[in-house]
From Swiss-Prot:
Protein species of origin: Zymomonas mobilis subsp. mobilis (strain ATCC 31821 / ZM4 / CP4)
Record-linked PROSITE patterns: FAD_FR, FLAVODOXIN_LIKE
Pathway membership: Sulfur metabolism; hydrogen sulfide biosynthesis; hydrogen sulfide from sulfite (NADPH route): step 1/1
Protein name: Sulfite reductase [NADPH] flavoprotein alpha-component
Organism lineage string: Bacteria, Pseudomonadati, Pseudomonadota, Alphaproteobacteria, Sphingomonadales
Cofactor: FAD; FMN
Length: 606
């Protein structure tokens, strides 16, 4: 800017300038960029209502800037948050960006992309998140085009406690390269404490693209600043700033002789204004069991009074372990590090065998590893092994149309024994055992736009949810009841025993009597010699299920275990489509994929 320009008076009276500052306070980089383009378009006489580009003077022949496509493939919202932050970074660098959920992406046109930046999580046994399944299948099919004119970079999220850590990111990265794409940067695989890695990757990507891609003007940025991606949340409460709520009900809903301990949890949100929809999850921040902490400290020869630094704060070790570190779930890196620090021969043998290491980490809690292997560590050494505490997510089991300022959960309490020592899950035992009624807990809503009731209240729905997977379908039924929805509803539920494990039995029976629940099919796996599961019940009703899908336009929903149940249900549905629709295996699989793309087959599996 020249000196003369810098001395030019601001062409706004103080009152108008104050109004402008008021309007723009608190806006994101993306929103400010859009407003900038909108106003520039107004000044040029362009039609800004459709975010069209202002007409350039005839003497100017600007080069059309490259559009950078960011694909967000998120399961719990973390990948989407990173993608949104990356979008804002690139917009601030005056680059043209299109951020889109992978589930909304027209992937058959992928070969037209110049730059793809993908942020993806991983679910189940190394599988892509639900919204990216159709895209994943397309990329790995014979239909996938060459990407010889496309550059890419991938940021993969995962959890090191699982064998196939960040596998989806690995797969996408490898496939982009196999199709001829140019890798801009090495793939990043990030664990649950991903924040620093994500920030570094975003910075590296932005700096690289600033040099590689011509910048766009404000109006061109505005044309892509508003893009078809669901923002994570507009609530003041989130993972980093949770709501302090109150536990109002903790009721066991399995029988006294059941092998399962399932709790119906009700949480009072007060007048917080926190809103959720059926299909969303509730994030619960928990604290570790003081007895577990004491056991770890005693085994390591520590008092708990030692001072350690956590996020720039100095805390007593025992307090830090209770509030800030994961103590219940082991992982392979921790086992390897503990073996190195203690030089324990048995652990050293285990870590030399990848399969043995994975099995040991998955089946041996941290405290039992310490007990079995022995060894003394300093406070700093111990916490250096541990991952930060992360919230647990639970499918919400209520509709606010029914329960208003409450949120309900269906929590399966994890309990087991190791060498005669009783162990329990960190979050589930916190809710079931350690949090008193009327006690406070920190919560937030994790929105899941990939698990929603159909917009049309007359559309039929088929709900498949064994065990605690039935939770969101309780919310679905409450919502449809309050909406006066006329669509048919069909529930498939399963558990070991009818007498002990029929969760919410009275409610389902009332919905049947009312006529809201058209059908309910029940699978009790241990009430007879031959085990019966929900997938068996699906096959028994193949003809009617096919009629609901093909003729009535039914929506299918699956919730629960990703490792076994969800795959078995997938296989059963493909068998039904193949058998009743007269298709071969490949055509049936494609039919199910089309249902996904139409949002008529949705899964919430974990």
């Amino acid at each position: 800017m020249t000196n003369e320009a810098s001395l030019t008076p601001i062409p706004l009276p103080a009152e108008k300038l104050a109004q402008l500052q008021t309007v723009t306070n608190g806006l994101s980089t993306a929103q400010i960029a859009w407003i900038s383009g909108y106003l520039w378009g107004r000044s040029s006489g362009a039609d800004t209502t459709n975010q069209s580009l202002p007409t350039s003077p005839a003497t100017e022949q600007p080069v059309e800037p490259t559009v950078i496509t960011i694909l967000s493939a998120s399961q719990t919202g973390n990948a989407r948050r990173i993608a949104e932050e990356l979008r804002d970074d690139l917009l601030a660098a005056h680059l043209k960006v299109n951020l889109i959920n992978t589930g909304d992406y027209k992937f058959k046109q992928i070969d037209r992309e110049k730059i793809i930046l993908m942020v993806t999580s991983t679910q189940g046994e190394g599988e892509p998140p639900e919204e990216a399944v159709a895209f994943y299948k397309f990329l790995f099919s014979k239909k996938a085009p060459k990407l010889t004119h496309t550059a890419f970079a991938v940021f993969g999220l995962g959890d090191i406690t699982y064998e196939h850590f960040a596998q989806a990111g690995n797969d996408f990265d490898r496939r982009f390269e196999e199709l001829g794409g140019e890798r801009l940067l090495p793939r990043v695989d990030a664990d649950v404490d991903y924040e620093e890695a994500a920030e570094a990757w975003r910075k590296e990507v932005t700096e690289l693209l600033e040099k590689r891609v011509p910048s766009a003007n404000s109006a061109q940025i505005a044309a892509t600043a508003i893009s078809p991606v669901d923002e994570v949340s507009s609530t003041p409460y989130d993972k980093e700033s949770p709501l302090t709520a109150t536990l109002s009900v903790n009721q066991k809903i399995t029988g006294r002789h059941s092998d399962k301990d399932v709790r119906h949890i009700e949480i009072d949100l007060g007048d917080s204004g926190l809103h959720y929809k059926p299909g969303d999850a509730l994030g619960v921040w928990y604290e570790n069991d003081p007895a577990l902490i004491r056991e770890c400290l005693d085994l390591l020869g520590l008092s708990g009074e030692e001072s350690i630094k956590v996020n720039d704060k100095i805390l007593p070790l025992a307090q830090a372990l209770q509030q800030s570190f994961e103590l219940t779930v082991n992982n392979t890196r921790l086992v390897e590090s503990y073996a190195t620090l203690t030089q324990n021969k048995a652990l050293e043998k285990i870590i030399s065998d990848k399969a043995a290491l994975q099995d040991y980490a998955q089946n041996t809690p941290i405290v039992d590893m310490i007990r079995q292997a022995g060894g003394k560590l300093t406070a700093e050494q111990f916490v250096s092994l541990l991952r930060p505490l992360t919230p647990r997510l639970y499918s919400i089991a209520s509709s606010q149309a029914e329960v208003e300022n409450e949120v309900h959960l269906t929590v399966g309490v994890v309990r087991y024994e190791i060498d005669g020592h009783k162990r329990a899950g960190g979050a589930s035992s916190f809710l079931a055992d350690r949090l008193a009624e009327n006690g406070n807990l920190r919560v937030f809503v994790e929105h899941n736009d990939n698990f929603r009731l159909p917009d049309n209240p007359d559309a039929p729905v088929i709900m498949i949810g064994p065990g605690t997977g039935v939770a969101p379908f309780r919310a679905f039924m409450q919502q449809r009841d309050n909406d006066g929805a006329k669509g048919k509803n069909w529930l498939f539920f399963g558990n070991p025993h009818f007498i002990e494990d029929f969760l919410y039995q009275v409610e389902w029976q009332a919905y049947v009597k009312q006529g809201l629940l058209t059908h309910i099919d029940l699978a009790w796996s241990r009430d007879q010699a031959k085990k019966v599961y929900v997938q068996d019940k699906l096959r028994e009703k193949a003809a009617e299920i096919w009629k609901w899908i093909k003729e009535d336009g039914a929506y299918l929903y699956v919730c629960g275990d990703a490792t076994h149940m969800a795959k078995d249900v997938d296989k059963a549905l493909i068998d039904i489509i193949r058998q009743e629709g007269g298709m071969d295996e490949e055509a049936a699989d494609e039919f199910l994929t089309e249902l996904r793309l139409e949002r008529r087959y949705q899964r919430d599996v974990y």
